[in-house]
């Protein structure tokens, strides 16, 4: 399996769907299904039954969207960019924005 290009905590832009153009942070990545949960994107209403600990009612929460419908936010100017991998001089393998060449993670 290839390395994950989008991980938890990344800043992304939605490219397609009802929330096209929205920006947010990845709350959860689901690599086996190829899906991500993005903060404030694809919000759905869930009807929950009351339990001993929690009250019932209608709860809004983010549903997952397919990873192909999101792109990384370029660290330099905030526009959508593709992600590549490169090995630095010290031997670390890092993700970088193909648009600007900036390193995404540390």
Swiss-Prot record:
PROSITE patterns: RIBOSOMAL_L24. This is Large ribosomal subunit protein uL24. The gene is rplX. Coiled coil: none annotated. It comes from Rhodospirillum rubrum (strain ATCC 11170 / ATH 1.1.1 / DSM 467 / LMG 4362 / NCIMB 8255 / S1). NCBIfam families: rplX_bact (TIGR01079). The keyword Translocase does not apply. InterPro entries: KOW, Rib_uL2_dom2, Ribosomal_uL24, Ribosomal_uL24_CS, Ribosomal_uL24_KOW, Translation_prot_SH3-like_sf. Part of the 50S ribosomal subunit. GO terms for molecular function: rRNA binding; structural constituent of ribosome. The lineage of its organism: Bacteria, Pseudomonadati, Pseudomonadota, Alphaproteobacteria, Rhodospirillales. Pfam families: KOW, ribosomal_L24. One of two assembly initiator proteins, it binds directly to the 5'-end of the 23S rRNA, where it nucleates assembly of the 50S subunit. One of the proteins that surrounds the polypeptide exit tunnel on the outside of the subunit. It comes from the Bacteria. Keywords: Ribonucleoprotein, Ribosomal protein, RNA-binding, rRNA-binding. Belongs to the universal ribosomal protein uL24 family. One of its GO terms (biological process) is translation. One of its GO terms (cellular component) is ribosome. PANTHER family: MITOCHONDRIAL RIBOSOMAL PROTEIN L24 (PTHR12903). Gene3D superfamilies: 2.30.30.30. SUPFAM superfamilies: Translation proteins SH3-like domain (SSF50104).
């Amino acid at each position: 399996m290839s390395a994950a290009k989008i991980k938890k905590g990344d800043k992304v832009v939605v490219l397609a769907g009802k929330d096209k153009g929205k920006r947010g942070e990845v709350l959860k990545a689901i690599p086996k299904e190829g899906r991500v949960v993005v903060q404030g994107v694809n919000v759905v209403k869930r009807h929950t039954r009351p339990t001993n600990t929690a009250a019932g009612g209608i709860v809004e929460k983010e549903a997952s969207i397919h990873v192909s419908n999101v792109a990384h936010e370029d660290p330099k100017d905030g526009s959508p960019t593709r992600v590549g991998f490169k090995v630095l001089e010290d031997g670390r393998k890092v993700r970088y924005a193909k648009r600007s060449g900036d390193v995404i993670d540390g």
